[in-house]
A protein has these predicted regions:
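Catalytic phosphate/metal-binding cores of nucleic-acid and nucleotide-processing enzymes, i.e., regions
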Residues: 273
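Structured, helix-rich domain cores that form ligand/interaction pockets
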Residues: 1-270, 278-330
């Protein structure tokens, strides 16, 4: 397998705490000034703070403040944002360190954890997986199976297979990550990149956190979960599906999973660098017009105006960038 495993979603609740800033500093080890304040929430919380795919929900309904505490929810983008901006570097990878902190802390529970396994070696074929599901060649206690096929005119544009119900505590999703991530004008859109995501909620999420903290080998843990949850088999005349032979391609994939490691901090651009790219793409032509029409002095005036209007969050982003890359002021 050419890619390692990644944690692609993490949600946890810190009970007996009401201050979101305390949670951001104590658990995420991030500058709370990076986060924007929102007058909306989710999961029964009325307010939130937000930064790059990380949502911190707080202020639950009256009477449940300590019971519900503060909830942190990080999407896949949020997990990468956390890796980029956190100061939490103990115990190897930042996410591993955060998971260990969740595990050892009182009144802290993981409510969702997604583990993503990527296949770039052509071990998994989405059409073959979908055909196996449709023909009943899946040995699993999970009864709900769903297949989605998308088309671009008459051409197939993607297949997604779900094993498990949307609201269940455990669900597996197979999909084409390259087609999700890239535009069809990008040559990488056509590469083989099939992702298997294991979505764990409730006790399954808490159990996975404990297992990660008590295991030095994430690959073996992931392969053990897969072996327990499902297998693709070759049906024969035997009515007992558990006695059917497991498909070689699935055995090869699970064996490959056993060898993967949790990916270390992904090489993703800092949010400030993405702002620079936006300036180049969207603003540079207008700046060149101003320069030709009025000269550089007007541009300096615009820059000074921007400095005066800089928000607390923007200043925090600059400070974070300087800390990450050890940039000195000139």
């Amino acid at each position: 397998m050419k890619s390692a495993a990644t944690i692609d979603w993490l949600t946890f609740t810190v009970k007996m705490v009401t201050d979101p800033v305390e949670v951001i500093k104590r658990f995420l080890y991030m500058d709370s000034n990076l986060f924007a304040d929102n007058d909306f929430g989710k999961f029964g919380y009325r307010k939130s703070m937000q930064f790059g795919g990380i949502m911190v929900y707080y202020d639950p309904a009256q009477g449940r403040k300590l019971e519900m505490g503060v909830c942190v929810s990080m999407t896949g983008v949020g997990c990468r944002t956390f890796e980029q901006h956190t100061r939490l570097t103990a115990a190897g990878t930042p996410l591993r360190a955060l998971i260990e902190q969740i595990y050892i802390s009182d009144n802290v529970h993981c409510t969702r954890l997604d583990l993503a396994l990527d296949d770039k070696d052509k071990l998994l074929d989405l059409d073959r997986i979908a055909d196996a599901v449709e023909s009943g060649c899946v040995n699993s206690r999970i009864r709900k199976r769903t297949i989605y096929r998308t088309y671009d005119n008459a051409n197939a544009a993607g297949t997604t297979v779900y094993i498990g119900a949307p609201a269940s505590d455990f669900r597996i999703r197979f999909y084409d990550k390259a087609k999700e991530k890239y535009e069809n004008t990008d040559e990488r859109y056509y590469m083989h990149w099939v992702r298997l995501e294991m979505v764990m909620r409730g006790k399954n999420a808490d159990g996975c956190v404990a297992a990660i903290c008590n295991s030095d080998d994430l690959g073996l843990l992931a392969s053990a979960i897969l072996n327990d949850k499902l297998a693709f088999v070759e049906r024969d005349s035997d009515s007992n599906i558990s006695r059917c032979h497991i498909c070689k391609w699935w055995l090869d994939f699970v064996d490959a999973v056993a060898a993967v490691k949790l990916v270390e901090k992904e090489d993703v651009p800092h949010k400030l660098e993405r702002s620079i790219e936006w300036i180049k793409d969207q603003v540079a032509p207008s700046l060149s017009l101003i320069y030709d029409a009025k000269g550089f002095f007007l541009i300096r005036e615009v820059l000074a105006l921007g400095f005066d209007k800089r928000s607390r969050q923007q200043q925090a982003l600059l400070d974070d960038y300087r800390n990450c890359y050890h940039v000195e002021e000139v």
